[in-house]
Structure formats: structure tokens, C-alpha cells
Swiss-Prot record:
The keyword Cell membrane does not apply. Pfam families: Oxidored_nitro (PF00148). Its EC number is 1.3.7.7. One of its GO terms (molecular function) is oxidoreductase activity, acting on the CH-CH group of donors, iron-sulfur protein as acceptor. Keywords: 4Fe-4S, ATP-binding, Chlorophyll biosynthesis, Iron, Iron-sulfur, Metal-binding, Nucleotide-binding, Oxidoreductase, Photosynthesis. Transmembrane segments: none annotated. This is Light-independent protochlorophyllide reductase subunit N. It comes from Prochlorococcus marinus (strain AS9601). It comes from the Bacteria. PANTHER family: LIGHT-INDEPENDENT PROTOCHLOROPHYLLIDE REDUCTASE SUBUNIT N. [4Fe-4S] cluster binds at residues 17, 42, 103. Belongs to the BchN/ChlN family. The lineage of its organism: Bacteria, Bacillati, Cyanobacteriota, Cyanophyceae, Synechococcales.
Length: 418
């Protein structure tokens, strides 16, 4: 393991809540509906993040907790029953309905697990109900997916059939390319979790080999282990290096010759390196500070240092699972400073003191930092963009080179004007 400096902070945080993950999960499973039990603020957050108007009838919605619910003057369970009945009558195509807890529903101790259990009995054979928490009280926004997947695991049937299970939401076109490569390697039985249809859950067991596509699925991994699955230890498929090592780890688990992997990946790697050059010219030697928000920070730091030659000032992450991140940490340069958790005021002080060329942070911090003359990149963009895989390396680098390129153009125009 590289000699990395680990630090831990606690204090005020600045993050989105887990409800945000509904935006990509509802697109992934078009036969599912996500019903948030929360406030008007929850409703505005998801609608804004998804970029759709509510009259378009998206596959998510909010059962609004009014002041009388929060004050205990009304039976929230009865009101929720009414909302669910109306929803299913209006949308009979729904196959799985996720009841998603929020900060307000947790504050009033609304028992969504019991609600889901009762609804499953009432709508048996018609709609399946599961519940999880999207509250941001103790979690960050990507952990919403972790909660959703964990809630589905008890519904997965058992099977001892050997298979590769890709765990974590990917863009459909990226997933298709990954599966094609695995089949070329000789791995034919490949499934994904979450699936593209919520009712087509993969069967799992002792011969299921799990390969993670996202680093924020700690609870999901733990429950898959309890079901007997084998977790393949690998970096995450971001950039050329991470993706190559990811495929190599899968090949090793299935006893496939390493030379075959290099033979199949070589054309992809060569094209990706050429495409990466123009971005590398912008990023090389620039100083990078990553504030904690998505749990993608360590993988991004590895990619931006090793493949784009950026200098790492500090790598923040909201939560660090050293077992899952072991292979990523091994690829970081010596003396990398990793800070788990957040005291946002102290971290902002360190940002100002170090004056980096680029800060990766949440949307709430970006504008204030830009006003101070510090270039930023929203970390949430990494989750909404198809960035996984060798052939996406240039697109991933482009997300970071774009703000620096923009600043160069603005600086040049300012100099010309003066």
C-alpha cells in the first residue's frame, strides 16, 4: 500500500441528501416508482435535480408531510395509504414501488418498513413494495443508491450458478460495452444489479462473483457477502488505468489468461491515450483539491494524478471504506492527504490557504469559491455523466479541463481588452 496520510474530521457538512439518487435510479428501472415521504423541500430538490416538470408524470413523486403531520395532529399512515391507492390506480404499469424515507419522516418516526409490509399483503401479485431511507441526516447523496440496492437484496432468489454480477448503476450504453468486452474474454453469464427492470432481479449465491462499478455501496456489499457472494477486489473503472485493472481482476477471478485481456483492451487503450492528450495538456501540473461529497473522490484523484499528471493538494471523502478502496489507495502517490468526513469551515480555510487551480465540490460551495477567484467543478456531474470505462477516459478528463480552459480563454480576453 502506498504511504498515504489518513485524517478524519467531524463538524458541519455541506452535502446533498440521498434523495438525489432517485434521479438516476428511476431512469435505470422504468417499471419502478419512487415515492418520497417528505416535505415540499424534498419535492423541489428531486424535481430540480431531475430537470423535469411534474406534469410530465415522471416515475417519482413526493407524499408531502404537512405541518399537521409533523405536529402529530394527523395520521400520516392513513394519508400515505390514500396516496398509494391513488397512485397505483393512476399508474397501473408500476411493478415496484419504493417508499423512500426523508429527514422529516425520520424525525416523526414514520415506520415505512411496516407500511411496506402491509401494502405488500394488500397488493400481492400486483405491485411489490420496498422501503429505504434517503435522509441526509447521516449520509451523503450517493448512499441513496446503496440503500435502494440493500432493500432489494432480500427479494433476490438463491442460485449456485457461476456468474459475474456488476453492481452499481451504469449508463446503459456503458454497461453494454462492458458486457461485450467480458463476453470477448470468455465470461458469458453476466448480470447487473440494479437490473433494467425492477422485477428481473438476478439470482445470487456462492458462485456469484461481484464486481463493483461504484465505490459507495458498502451496505450492499456487506449484504451480498452474507448471501455467499464473492467480492472481487479491484480499482473502479474510471480512466484507462482503473478500467484495465478492473477487467484484469475479473479475468483473474474467472481464471482467464492476462495476455488475452491485454490483447482485447489494447486497441481501446491506444485510442483512449490519444484522445486524452488534449485534456492532459490543460491539466498537467495543475493543483487539485477535492472536497467530500460523492465517495468518488479517491478514484478521481487517482485518475487525475496518474493519467492527467495533476498534483493532489487534498482528497476529501465523506466516508472511507478501506476494504473497498484498498486497490485504489494502492495506486495513489505517496504522501497523498486523504481526509474522511468534513468540517466545512476548516476545509474551506485550507482551500483558501493552498489556492489550488481547481476544486471539486458540491454545488452549494461552487459559486462562493468562484466569487473568490477559485475555479470549481461540481462533483454531482460525475454521477450524472457516463464516465466509466477506457473509452470514456477523455470525456472524464474533459469534465475537469473544461473549467480550466474556460478560465484561460477569459483571462486571455481580459488581457486583450486591457
Amino acid at each position: 500500500m502506498s504511504k498515504v496520510e489518513f485524517n478524519k474530521e467531524t463538524g458541519p457538512r455541506e452535502v446533498f441528501c440521498g434523495l438525489t439518487s432517485i434521479v438516476w435510479l428511476h431512469r435505470r428501472m422504468p417499471d419502478a416508482f419512487f415515492l418520497v415521504v417528505g416535505s415540499r423541500t424534498c419535492a423541489h430538490l428531486i424535481q430540480s435535480a431531475a430537470g423535469v416538470m411534474i406534469f410530465a408524470e415522471p416515475r417519482f413523486g413526493t407524499a408531502i408531510l404537512e405541518e399537521k403531520d409533523l405536529a402529530g395532529l394527523a395520521d400520516a399512515h392513513e394519508e400515505l395509504d390514500r396516496v398509494v391507492n391513488d397512485l397505483i390506480a393512476r399508474r397501473p404499469e408500476i411493478k415496484t414501488l419504493f417508499l423512500v424515507g426523508s429527514c422529516p419522516s425520520e424525525v416523526i418516526k414514520l415506520d415505512l418498513a411496516t407500511v411496506a409490509e402491509k401494502l405488500n399483503k394488500r397488493f400481492l401479485g400486483q405491485v411489490r413494495f420496498v422501503n429505504y431511507s434517503g435522509s441526509g441526516i447521516e449520509t451523503t447523496f450517493t448512499q441513496g443508491e446503496d440503500g435502494a440496492l440493500k432493500a432489494l437484496i432480500p427479494l433476490m432468489e438463491s442460485s449456485n450458478e457461476e456468474k459475474l454480477l456488476l453492481v452499481g448503476t451504469l449508463a446503459n450504453n456503458v454497461e453494454d460495452r462492458f458486457k461485450k468486452i467480458f463476453k470477448n474474454l470468455g465470461i458469458s453469464n453476466i448480470e447487473s444489479f440494479p437490473p433494467r427492470q425492477s422485477t428481473e432481479l438476478p439470482k445470487i449465491g456462492k458462485n456469484t462473483k461481484v464486481l463493483l462499478t461504484q465505490p459507495y455501496l458498502s451496505d450492499t456489499v456487506r449484504d451480498l457477502k452474507h448471501r455467499g457472494c464473492e467480492i472481487i477486489s479491484a480499482p473502479f473503472p474510471l480512466g484507462i488505468e482503473g478500467s484495465t485493472e478492473w477487467f484484469l481482476a475479473a479475468a483473474k477471478a474467472f481464471k482467464i489468461n492476462e495476455l488475452k485481456v491485454h490483447e482485447i483492451l489494447s486497441p481501446l487503450i491506444n485510442r483512449a491515450k490519444l484522445a486524452l492528450e488534449s485534456h492532459k495538456e490543460i491539466l498537467k501540473g495543475k493543483r487539485l483539491f477535492l472536497l467530500p461529497e460523492s465517495q468518488l473522490e479517491i478514484s478521481l484523484a487517482r485518475f487525475l494524478h496518474n493519467e492527467c499528471e495533476m498534483d493532489l493538494v487534498e482528497v476529501g471523502t465523506p466516508y472511507l471504506n478501506k476494504d473497498l478502496m484498498k486497490e485504489e489507495i494502492n495506486l495513489l502517490p505517496d504522501n497523498t492527504k486523504i481526509v474522511e468526513g468534513q468540517h466545512v469551515e476548516k476545509q474551506l480555510d485550507r482551500v483558501r490557504e493552498s489556492n489550488p487551480d481547481l476544486v471539486v465540490c458540491g454545488m452549494g460551495l461552487a459559486n462562493p469559491l468562484e466569487a473568490e477567484g477559485i475555479s470549481t467543478k461540481w462533483s454531482i456531474e460525475m454521477v450524472f455523466s457516463p464516465i466509466h470505462g477506457i473509452d470514456q477516459a477523455a470525456d472524464l478528463a474533459g469534465l475537469f479541463s473544461k473549467p480550466l480552459r474556460r478560465n484561460q480563454i477569459l483571462t486571455t480576453k481580459t488581457l486583450v481588452t486591457h
